[in-house]
Amino acid sequence: AMEQLKTKRLWSHSQNAAGMPFDDIQNYSNVILGYDLQDGNYCRPQEGQKETIVGVSSEGFINLKNAYVWGAFNFAQNNLTDAGYNASIADPFRGMPYYIADQHLSKWRNQYYVLKFRAATPLFGNHWALGLEGNYVATLAAKQRDPRVDTRFYTLELTPGITYRLNNSHKFGASFKYSSIKEDSRMSNVNSYVDQDYYILYGLGTAIKGIGSGVTSNYIGDRFGGALQYNFSMPSFNLLLEGSYDVKAETVQQSYTTPKKI
């Protein structure tokens, strides 16, 4: 029943929180505990040959009459074994080509925190509604073998939206998205008597070899985007169409004392 309710709330799957008045607005809440284990080498080398995930998540919706509010929280502890070719960033698959790699298989200990909320007004004049969505993601990741890394990744995203109800069958919406991206990556060696080899990747198969305890990297980025929605609904039929466009730019600097752009 819970999954069916969430599936039928079409606007909750869109990028516009202002569509909440058009969905089923009955209150609900749930808590989920999870455990996942993956073992084997049929994977990308950065993913590790063994992965265990323990997590807890919760979400809920409440109708406050003067506002509709939804919120969710997720925490996951992710342990990787025998992961390679990454020595600097929490997620080597997020589209950032400039990071540090090494050839030593290592364990990783990662923690993920996700906070989300949506809030919307009831319809003004039986036509207009305003909404706001917010997402905050924090990731702590630590490589367990020299050259080690302690990296902190953060994302804060806000998405205001507006909807217009023409009649019972036709609704229109528009939303704008802004995200701020930040990652602080600091490499080091526990065994200071043995220098380690590492490679500074520049993308397109280009890399520079380094020897020592690694580098400190500072990643800063922004994302802008927007989306348009159209909803056609009847008692026995409900259709939501959405088109979106995002632009993301991210830079990386090595060292805080003498910053060097990559």
Predicted regions, residues:
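Outer-envelope beta-barrel architecture signal
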Residues: 25-29, 65-71, 126-130, 168-172, ...
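Transmembrane beta-barrel strands of outer-membrane/channel proteins
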Residues: 29-37, 71-79, 132-138, 174-180, ...
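Residues on the lipid-exposed face of transmembrane beta-strands in outer-membrane beta-barrel proteins
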Residues: 56-62, 115-121, 158-164, 226-232, ...
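N-terminal, post-signal peptide beta-strand-biased segments of exported outer-membrane/organellar beta-barrel
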Residues: 1-83
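Residues that define the transmembrane beta-barrel architecture of outer-membrane proteins
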Residues: 50-56, 109-115, 152-156, 220-226, ...
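Long, internal scaffold/assembly segments composed of regular secondary structure
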Residues: 212-262
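Outer-membrane beta-barrel proteins
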Residues: 38-53, 104-108, 140-153, 215-219
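Outer-membrane beta-barrel translocator domains and adjoining extracellular loop/strand segments
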Residues: 41-46, 82-88, 141-149, 185-191, ...
